[in-house]
């Protein structure tokens, strides 16, 4: 897994630099040297890319550690419930390392904008991985990140319109925090991340860092339907066109639900799932002490043109 690869990288750097594991690699202990490959330098003078290196005490090439492990645990207290199929898979360190690939995530705009994006991302992913039907009804909206693989998929998610570009050689059911689905999504995401996910989609369900990276790929990038990225919407970087305004599409959390579900939860049939997303979001906004903003619902929004590129399906 890539998380362990980072640890190996740190050890290899020690060998290449001709130092022992007890010899400082960076900082004042090493002549104010910085770490290669943009790694963080810890207070002890060692290079790495986890919280221990990049947050408290970090001396150079540090990361934004506003969203702490404690917050992660408070948001997702039941993810390691014994009944959860994904028990032990999702960790704060894996999330933290994955965000390195997307420096704009949670780092765009003022503090409230950053908080709002974090709340929105974890709300949408909590609904996608909800273990409500497994754990039970206690402690409302604490069921997120219980699932890694889609429960009882009713399709192999091979889109005939894109199979010439992205041949279907496996099953492309939902995996990871945003339950990545469809052959084209695995193909495009794999190309972006330098991974052969079309042949090996199971990597999204076996490598925690890659799993978060795949979710963030969908979140951070605009889509071929003409839909903006979720990141652009929630940070205020997207402004609706005249066509968007006529279609009822407005900036806000509801627009994210429209994008992620391709409008599937903006109808009467999807009302319960849409409300779940909103309730997760309100809980997380309260935890982060930020106003959720306007336009939480997508009821009156038209979907973007369906050319087979956005077909994310929510869970109960």
UniProtKB/Swiss-Prot annotation:
Catalytic residues (UniProt): 128 (proton donor)
Matching InterPro entries: Chitin-bd_1, Chitin-binding_1_CS, Endochitinase-like_sf, Glyco_hydro_19, Glyco_hydro_19_cat, Lysozyme-like_dom_sf
Intrachain S-S bonds: 26-41, 35-47, 40-54, 58-62, 84-146, 158-168, 266-298
MF-aspect GO terms: chitin binding; chitinase activity; endochitinase activity
UniProt catalytic activity: Random endo-hydrolysis of N-acetyl-beta-D-glucosaminide (1->4)-beta-linkages in chitin and chitodextrins
Residues in the signal sequence: 1-23
Matches recorded under Gene3D superfamilies: 1.10.530.10, Endochitinase, domain 2, Endochitinase-like
Coiled coil residues, start to end: none
The protein's enzyme class: hydrolase
Residue stretches making up the Chitin-binding type-1 domain: 24-64
Keywords per UniProt: Carbohydrate metabolism, Chitin degradation, Chitin-binding, Disulfide bond, Glycosidase, Hydrolase, Plant defense, Polysaccharide degradation, Signal
SMART domains membership: ChtBD1 (SM00270)
EC number: 3.2.1.14
Example of a GO biological process term: chitin catabolic process
Entry similarity comment: Belongs to the glycosyl hydrolase 19 family. Chitinase class I subfamily.
Function: Defense against chitin-containing fungal pathogens.
Official protein name in the record: Endochitinase WIN8
């Amino acid at each position: 897994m890539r998380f362990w690869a980072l640890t190996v990288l740190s050890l290899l750097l020690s060998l290449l630099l001709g130092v022992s594991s007890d010899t400082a690699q960076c900082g004042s202990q090493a002549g104010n040297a910085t770490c290669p490959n943009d790694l963080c330098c810890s207070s002890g003078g060692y290079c790495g890319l986890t919280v221990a290196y990049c947050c408290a005490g970090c001396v150079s090439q540090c990361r934004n550690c506003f969203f702490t492990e404690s917050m992660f645990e408070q948001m997702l207290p039941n993810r390691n419930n014994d009944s959860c199929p994904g028990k032990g898979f999702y960790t704060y360190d894996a999330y933290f390392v994955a965000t390195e690939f997307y420096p704009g995530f949670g780092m765009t705009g003022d503090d409230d904008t950053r908080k709002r994006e974090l709340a929105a991302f974890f709300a949408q992913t909590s609904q996608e991985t909800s273990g409500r039907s497994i754990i039970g009804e206690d402690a409302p909206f604490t069921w997120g990140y219980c699932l890694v693989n889609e429960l009882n998929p009713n399709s192999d998610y091979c889109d005939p319109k894109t199979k010439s570009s992205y041949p279907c050689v496996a099953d492309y059911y939902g995996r990871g925090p945003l339950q990545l689905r469809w052959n084209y999504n695995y193909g495009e995401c794999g190309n972006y991340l330098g991974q052969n996910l079309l042949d090996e989609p199971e990597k999204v369900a076996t490598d925690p860092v890659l799993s978060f990276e795949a979710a963030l790929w969908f979140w951070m990038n605009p889509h071929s339907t003409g839909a903006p990225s979720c990141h652009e919407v929630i940070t205020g970087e997207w402004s609706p066109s005249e066509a968007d305004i006529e279609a009822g599409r407005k900036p806000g959390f509801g627009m994210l639900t429209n994008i992620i579900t391709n409008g599937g939860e903006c109808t009467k049939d999807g009302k319960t799932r849409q409300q779940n997303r909103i309730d997760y979001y309100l809980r997380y906004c309260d935890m982060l002490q930020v106003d959720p903003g306007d336009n939480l619902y997508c009821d009156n929004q038209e979907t973007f043109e369906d050319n087979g590129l956005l077909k994310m399906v929510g869970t109960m």
